[in-house]
Amino acid sequence: MQNEAKTRQEIIDKRLASAGWDVKNPSQVTSELDIWVGLPDMVKEPISEYQGHQFADYALFGDDGFPLAVVEAKKTSRDARIGQEQARQYAENIQKNSGRDMPFVFYTNGHDIYFWDTEKYPPRKVYGFPTKKGMASSRLKTAGKMCSYISQRCREKDLKP
């Protein structure tokens, strides 16, 4: 049985590397990404226990310097699915802080990897991590479909009497 740190170092890092991610390059993969968690702007006092920092086990970055996905890691003896909500919260808080969509989350115990496109599909078990290029392409397709949908809705609204 491995602890989470060993699982990350001995299994998850290797699986990311086999998909082409340079786990030693922080412009591609950052471990322990510090995510600020704050209250909504209209809430000024008192300071809440819900404010502070979260640390995503991994953030996978695109060429533009923004995260494409977060990865929540669990030790090998734990069910990877217990990281689902935690990973979603990380993605949601990154999105709030950056103002950019962050729909892709992964959670894994090193052996089982789950992928969740939080905007389009339910979580599903996958065999490995995608390449950086593949993930960036999927994100562009998602963004393109959203822009197309928004444009269509605006045109429909403008055409109504």
Protein language model features and the residues they cover:
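ATP-dependent helicase/translocase motor core
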Residues: 1-161
